[in-house]
Amino acid sequence: MEPGGDHRSRSGGGRGGPGPAVTSARGRRLPPTAASGGTEPEEDDGGQALQLEGGALGSWGSTPLPSSRARGPASSGRKYSDHCEARASRPGKSRIPGRDHRRYYHDHWRLEYLMDFIPSRHGMVCMVCGSSLATLKLSTIKRHIRQKHPYSLHWSPREKEVISNSWDAHLGLGAGGEAESLGAQGAEEEEEEDEEEEEGANLQACPPKGSGKAPAGGGCRRQRRGVRGGSVAPRRRRLAASRRAGGSRGLGARRLERRLKESLQNWFRAECLMDYDPRGNRLVCMACGRALPSLHLDDIRAHVLEVHPSSLGLSGPQRSALLQAWGDQPEALSELTQPSPDDDLVPQDLTRKSRDSAPAAGAPSSQDLSPPDVKEEAGWVPERPGPAEEEEGEGEGEREGIPNRPRRGRDHRRHYQERWRLEYLMELDGCRRGLVCMVCGGALASLKMSTIKRHIRQRHPGSNSLSGPVKALIAQEWSEKAAHLLALGLPRPESPSVPVAPSTASASEEGGGAEEAEPEEEWWGDAPLSPGAPSERPAEEEDDEDDSQEPGGLAFPPLPLPPPPPPPPPPPRSREQRRNYQPRWRGEYLMDYDGSRRGLVCMVCGGALATLKVSTIKRHILQVHPFSMDFTPEERQTILEAYEEAALRCYGHEGFGPPAPAPRDSGADLKPGAVCRA
């Protein structure tokens, strides 16, 4: 066998090819002289490139030779060497001009942009969000990061390495990308392959001996084989025996489990700002210090959106500052993540809400986990409660003996939306952990949108029509009076029972109780659409309210007065929801709203209409009494007065509405068409 015979070439004529080709230790073929007709170095049939040492040949293996462009027919039409193969995403012919137009994957994209390569579909997948990218282009990567998670561009190399290791652990791979199956049968084969690769690398590291000492390469290889047969094989047998004995199987599984938990913890910290507690198998928010009920992404998303949505806009440096501040407080972390001894919640039970006990007096609170200087430096300040809530929290903490003690556990404040304050005039009551209506002073038991809408529909439906400036003025006066009452030191009820206020008296009560509650509620129901209607509320009711609040120690301020509005239109009769009922239908179509059936009732014939639609009204009039369209304004006024009198006789005592003013002619008879309907 001639020197260098272990290398195959496809130039015609046989092995080695014609011409004075100079060979080296491992069968390398050096470039021939200009006079020779040899061929350029080419790949073998398996698509593997020649192994070239850069120390002896310089940059010949990375750039094409100038003479290679002028080759004859022996070059088989090849114009370029495989200079891109070292960077290709797969071995062989990748990114060869004229043959394969697909792009190739760069290894530095993994740590720089956190993009992993999937050989099965020749594409990339994002290690941050798990999305698949369509093309292997840098512009695609940057556009994806800019649209999905721009904050990841500001992560430090250490944080990116954490994400990469977490991704490998998620796929069951090692830190270097090798399959990690500890305690499995395939581990021995993988180690054998690694040893063979290591041996090949050592063989390539042998220095070239020149053209006349080609057999030295074979001697070097035989020497390596002898070393391998003497030391590697016994070590492999010992490793196989120990693994068959099962000694390292449990240890490897535990080590893999520990690495998975650590990588999961680092991923939650960098991506979700959540600290993972492996002992309790739960998450703790690094922004507010609260424990989450489970590890589901839905719970994480709901917690962030309800408690501190502003944390979603944090930039990379801000997140890094928050992570550093959280990592600098190990005492607070251990106090927070350690379950309380009297906690009856099993740590692995992820279906129930976590019940965290309050920290001790000397332990830092959850709000102190992110120091103020770090948050100010990051430019992010969490939402602060209103003045009334701060005063309430301070008052409660002083009564318990712990100043500014945060409430932990099932805190319903996380469900409170700040927009409810101006949109529905609802304030959070920190004492009862419920809502307080700033219109009537009523207390709502639950922090639910359905409860708010039902309360407004039943008590004061007219408050929905208040303008924005009027609602802002009401909220401002409420906050001022609440702060004034707290400054006076008025006692607050400790029990969660709702105190009976003059404005929250039930409409179903008999006698004078309902009559006392109705004028105030109807006054709010009469509130006009525009700011400026005159206040028709008598001063006697205000005096009665002030007198009734002092002995009872009411925790909420009295009802504020809006600015004087213009004269209001005729109010609707019922306190039920009438968002689709138009008051003008009363005089224009002689249609009244029936609160018991939530529909319309005709004042002419007493018929009931199913839907609150103008088309239904017109169809009813055309089919039943089309002559009513020709009524004069005087006739319509007469029908309205007769209907008011009939309604007063039928259900004036049931709280349907305040008694209508007496008609001009008290002795007027009812019209035949006026029928009283409940």
From Swiss-Prot:
Composition bias type Pro residues, residue spans: 557-572
Database matches in InterPro entries: SPIN-DOC_Znf-C2H2, Znf_C2H2_type, ZnF_transloc-Spindlin_int
Biased composition (Basic and acidic residues): 79-88, 573-583
Keyword Metal-binding appears in the UniProt entry: no
Any Pfam family hit: zf-C2H2_12
Cross-link Glycyl lysine isopeptide (Lys-Gly) (interchain with G-Cter in SUMO2), sequence positions: 375
Biased composition (Low complexity): 66-78, 205-214, 493-509
Region (Disordered): 1-100, 174-250, 333-413, 493-583
Gene Ontology CC terms: nucleus
Disulfide bonds: none
Compositionally biased residues, Acidic residues: 187-200, 512-524, 539-549
Keywords on record: Isopeptide bond, Ubl conjugation
Protein name per Swiss-Prot or TrEMBL: Zinc finger translocation-associated protein
Organism: Mus musculus
Classification of source organism: Eukaryota, Metazoa, Chordata, Craniata, Vertebrata
Gene: Zfta
